[in-house]
Each structure stands twice: as C-alpha cells, then as structure tokens.
Amino acid sequence: MLKKLTLLIAGFFVVLQVSAQSQTPNIIFILADDLGYGDLGSYGQKLILTPNIDQLSKEGMTFTDFYAGAPVCSPSRSVLMTGLNSGHTTIRGNMTKKGGNPGKKGVQTIYRANLSEKDFTIGNLLQQSGYTTAMAGKWHLDGYDTLATPIHRGFDQFSGWLVSYPETYSNGYWPAQRYINGKTKIIQKNTDSKKGYYADQITTDEAIDFLSGQQNTKKPFLLMVNYNNPHSPLDAPDESVYANKDWPKDMKTYASMIYNLDQSVGKLKQYLIDNGLSKNTIVFFCSDNGARSEGTKQLTAVAEFFNSNGDLKGYKRDMYDGGIRVPMIVWAPGIIEPGKVNSTPGYFADIMPTFADIAKSKVKYTSDGTSIYSLLNGKQNAVKPRFLYWEFFENGFEQAVRYGDWKAVKKAGKIELYDLKKDIGETKDVSIQNPDIIKKIETYLLTSRVESPFWPVD
C-alpha cells in the first residue's frame, strides 16, 4: 500500500511538472540604454566586470549579428514595440523634423512624436494572446503626450519615467517622482535633491514586485525591464568595485554603471530561479543602440578607453555597425542549450513575430520582421537571408541595409558597400567591385519605406 501511495505521489509531481512546462512560456525582455557591443565580457570586454550577464551568455544563446531598430533611442524602441522597421514605424527620430508635440529639454523647446492609438504594439499582441503585460523603467515613446503611455499602448501595468511627466526624470538617476499606472508617486529618498534610491534599483524592485504577483496565476506574462544604464550622465551609486583601479574618475563611474546594470540582471535572474519561474520563462537581454561617444569629450574618452564598440565602426547616431549592432543574449533553461552562439543577422523588428511564436498567438499583426524562435530551438539556419533596413535623419537622410554578409550605407545619394564577413569594421568600400549587389540593394530601397509627416525627406 505504501509503495502504491509513493508511486501515486511521484506520478502526481511528474504530471504537475509536465503541466507547468507545457504552459505557454513567460517572456522577460531586458533593455540596456546605450550599452555598446563591446561593453560586456561575453562580447570581448576586458576591463569592465559583467559576471551575471556573462553567465547568461554561458547558459543561453549569444547572438553575434543582432541589431537595434535605429542608432538612437526613440526610433529604436518604436521598431521594437511595433515590429516595423524605421522606414515604416511611427517614430523615426528622438525629435521630429516637422510638427509633433512641443516640450522642453532644458530651456529649449523641442518637438517629439508619440506612438498613436493606431500603432499595434507587442503589448497589444500579447494582451490579446492571453498574457499579462507589464513594463518597468524607460518608455520614451510618449512624445509629450500624457495619453501615450504604456498603459495606453498595450500594457496592463507600468511603473517608470515618461518625457510627458518631467518630474519623473528631472533629477536624472535619482528621480523624486515615479509614474505608476496613471499616477505619480513621490520617492521620498530622492526629494530635495537627495540621492537615496537609484533609478535602476527602483526599476529592478518594481520588476520583482510584478513577478511576485505572478507566481500563483495561470496566465503567462510579458515583462519589459528598461534600464537607464549606462546612458549619460555619468552617475553610479557605488564605485567601490573599481576603487583600486588607476583610472580617471569618469572611467570608474562608467564601469560602475555597467557593473550596476549587471548586478540588476543578476538579481532578476536569481529571483526567477528561487521562485520557480526560471523553468518556463524566456529572458532576452539587449541594448537599444550602440555606445555613445558624441556630445562631449568626456563621453568620447570613456568610449575609447573601454573600446565600447569593439571592432565595429562608429557609435550611437552612426549607421555603421557601431551605432546599431548590439549585444543580444537569450536565456531559457530547458529550452535553449547552454553556450550556443548564433551568427544569423536579426533586428528589433524580429521581436514581435518571435513573441507571437512563443505565445502561439493567433492574433493578426503586421511586421517587417521574421521570427527567430526556431533559432532558439537549435535550428541554426532556420532564418533565410533577407533585407534588414534602417533610416536616420540627424545627419541628413541616411539609409542602411544588411543582406546576408553584405552591409550597405547610403549617404547623400551614394551607396557604400561592405563585406562584413571579411571586414567587420567597415573599412573597405567594395561597391565598385560588386555592381550586381548594388543593383539588388537599389531595387530594394525603392520599396523599403513610406513617407513620414514628421520626418519628410528633403
């Protein structure tokens, strides 16, 4: 009798475990801000410590040829949210060229665009697919419109900062207020310019608070965790880990910001493991664009000191790979074999179809991307060569295309062509030697985009 009871109990737990594994996976997408391709140990960094993110890489899949949506924040995140490339998505720059919503950046009046009610987001997609959706941290797609927050664009919960609520970011990394589900909340530790509660620590705590409410629910969830680090200004809560380094102060601060980011990721991962969520959760880690070097000599010196973009050419705001190629690591114990490296080109527009596949969604949507979910399951060549597209307006109208190993950058009407397999640093223009490839790219560019009222082509 005792033996039968033992077998029955064992069988019950096996059924329970199989049932849990058969549920649609949860999704967590962690986004760093201005983290360079070469800023992580798993991508070649020698000076900055990133043990937790490196461990994600060892235990998951590391993408070598993954790209953000644009070389700056807002359009890149717009591509991520809508699944449309920067020639189709609503927001194509941090500030508009024409029209938009007025607001203040310091004493200057600037104009921004926002995601509209017509924009179908990954939040909308997963909401309609039965997921609970949440976001913590940076949004940057409201464009001074208080009715264009994440909770108006497909997210059940949002806590973070918004450009339409200046009080939530006016004190940089030490915000005195936080926007939480339609209301602002005072952060007492940061009032009167105090520095008691670091922004990314707040974001991590908010993410864990959300996760704590998901353990006893049958609904799967999407959680977007959008950190500020290591975006300027240089400001870290603790620099003790590099105290003994013979480095200039700015270098210690930047390295400490990335170390803080790494510790935040480690804290989230450990929470998933400790609370039984890791077995059915897929975690993505990425950056919104390349490392920043422009703006001040201070930022240039930091980027060069750490070689933040590795062997890539350019930085944030460049259409060369240093501006748009980013780290991408996916961690999912039991789904992804550890230590895998994938060189298939992909970009932010792929995230929406990938999430749709993970969710087994039947919801209709439009995307310029292709699901990379099959790559996570070990099918190395499952995604066929296709065109990846970017456009940018801050330096005049520029376009970029990736097709297989070919990378094209079009400036002032002239196309430069690089063979990334032989020339990852985009140092040798081989357009003259490859007229057939140029013709193919020119043909693609004829239909790669639609006009935008906010970013007209002069």
Where is each model-derived feature located?
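Formylglycine-dependent sulfatase
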Residues: 2-3, 20-411, 415, 424-458
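Bacterial N-terminal signal peptides
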Residues: 6-17
